[in-house]
């Protein structure tokens, strides 16, 4: 890491540590009280800081499912340690509203590739999260340690990204941050943090999510939301250490960071507008826009349509090559008595495939194994999801259970190398079953299965994942 990056990290770390000292010295009545951590604090925090953005939630996007992990119940220590809850009420707010959360995850991954090689591992781990209360209703700190430990990891079948390559454990301090806020207008976060903004996101599809080093400021100004940031480094899901943003993008030797800008709005009920830009000096720029509209036609029947557009091109010294590409996608669907169904189409310019080194592709046709975003590719997909808990189409209910089926195919893709040859047709079918077990709050079981015909290959790709999440509030 270059000198400038090291100095920035030291400054942000000093701010985090300084907050610990200040937190002890402020009296208990010095700020507006948050909700007691004996109940979920997410609601109270979102009312005072811009944590909820006016853009589509992933689980509402039919063809890009991301089922939320349920939150756990009352914190264990406050429930079972006599007098602890009452004692903490008398502490300064910085300590009184402290939360500690343990998230356990078990993940089994098995994929048979078209060349008959195999990727297989079973890992156990998760993360431990600390978050302070607000000091003077303005400042707080937090940190998250992540781990992934191999339970079964054959040496001859690496490549799952559950573990550090080839099959080694992961132990890392993925988040360590300080935050300043002013009402809902501004929330400044410095140092190691989560970022979830279109092409820069968590990519939380294995044991450990992507986390970033940098500074961001986001907020809400009336109907508008914004986020502006400068990100210097990224820790990928299979890594323990952070690497320069430009290096992750392929520009080795460059210390350029990523400038993130986002503007979103909800001008009328049901209409969500989202636009973002991601710029890396001398590497490339990505501009992304997403419009979603959801409208209830009659009771229990809603229609939903969406449009996405991406412009991506090299800039400056073209450190990763001179290229430009565009992509466009649209989708439509309906929600009726617990059933969600619809279709999407996507087309990508022949200039280049989309580059997505900072997370998963946010497109409608991002599937379990394949992203249908190759150069020149034209793709379409259909899907249906049913909520067995809230749905009323069937004569029975299974609380917490959702099932998703989806199918997509992509054609006309081309190699952008010297040959410019045609690439084979790709088809994928997915089954995704998620069960938020109702009698154990915070416990989720998920099964994901994919079948991929990679065009012209004798052996299809077969992959399945078994995932267990258990969220346990500790304090």
What residue ranges belong to the model's regions?
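Short loop/turn motifs that connect adjacent beta-strands in outer-membrane beta-barrel proteins
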Residues: 33, 77, 81-100, 131-142, ...
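Solvent-exposed loop/turn segments connecting transmembrane beta-strands
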Residues: 114-120, 182, 202-209, 233-236, ...
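Outer-membrane beta-barrel "beta-signal"
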Residues: 261, 382, 406, 435, ...
């Amino acid at each position: 890491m270059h000198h400038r990056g090291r100095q920035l990290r030291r400054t942000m770390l000093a701010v985090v540590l300084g907050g610990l000292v200040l937190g002890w010295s402020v009296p208990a009545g010095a700020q507006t009280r948050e909700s007691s951590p004996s109940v979920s604090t997410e609601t109270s925090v979102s009312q005072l800081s811009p944590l909820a953005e006016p853009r589509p939630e992933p689980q509402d996007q039919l063809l890009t499912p991301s089922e939320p992990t349920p939150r756990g119940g009352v914190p264990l220590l406050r429930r079972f340690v006599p007098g602890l809850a009452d004692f903490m009420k008398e502490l300064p707010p910085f300590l009184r509203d402290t939360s500690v959360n343990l998230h356990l995850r078990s993940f089994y991954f098995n994929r048979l590739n078209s060349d008959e090689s195999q990727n297989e591992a079973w890992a156990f781990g998760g993360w431990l999260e600390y978050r302070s209360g607000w000091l003077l209703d303005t400042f707080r700190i937090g940190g998250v340690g992540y781990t992934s430990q191999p339970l079964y990891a054959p040496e001859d079948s690496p490549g799952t990204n559950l573990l550090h390559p080839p099959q080694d454990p992961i132990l890392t301090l993925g988040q360590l941050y300080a935050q300043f806020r002013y009402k809902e207008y501004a929330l400044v976060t410095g140092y190691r943090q989560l970022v979830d903004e279109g092409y820069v996101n968590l990519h939380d599809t294995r044991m450990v999510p992507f986390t970033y080093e940098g500074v961001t400021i986001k907020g809400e100004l009336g109907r508008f939301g914004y986020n502006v940031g400068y990100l210097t480094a990224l820790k990928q899901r299979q890594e323990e250490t952070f690497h320069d943003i430009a290096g992750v993008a392929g520009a080795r030797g460059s210390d350029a960071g990523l400038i993130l800008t986002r503007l979103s709005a909800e001008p009328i009920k049901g209409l969500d507008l989202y636009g973002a830009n991601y710029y890396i000096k001398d590497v490339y720029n990505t501009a992304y826009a997403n419009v979603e509209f959801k409208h209830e036609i009659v009771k229990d029947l809603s229609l939903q349509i969406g449009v996405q557009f991406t412009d991506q091109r090299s800039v400056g010294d073209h450190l990763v090559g001179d290229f430009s590409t565009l992509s466009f996608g649209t989708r439509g669907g309906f929600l009726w008595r617990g059933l969600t169904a619809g279709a999407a189409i996507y087309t990508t310019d022949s200039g280049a495939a989309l580059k997505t080194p900072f997370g998963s592709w946010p497109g409608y046709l991002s599937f379990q194994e394949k992203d249908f975003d190759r150069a020149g590719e034209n793709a379409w997909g259909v899907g249906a999801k049913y909520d067995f808990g809230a749905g009323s189409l069937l004569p029975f209910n299974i609380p917490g259970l959702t099932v998703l089926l989806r199918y997509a195919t992509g054609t006309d893709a081309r190699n952008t190398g010297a040959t410019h040859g045609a690439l084979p047709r790709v088809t994928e079918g997915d089954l995704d079953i998620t069960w938020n077990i109702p009698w154990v709050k915070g416990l989720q079981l998920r099964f994901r299965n994919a079948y991929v015909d990679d065009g012209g290959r004798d052996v299809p790709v077969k992959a399945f994942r078994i995932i267990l999440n258990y969220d346990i509030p500790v304090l």
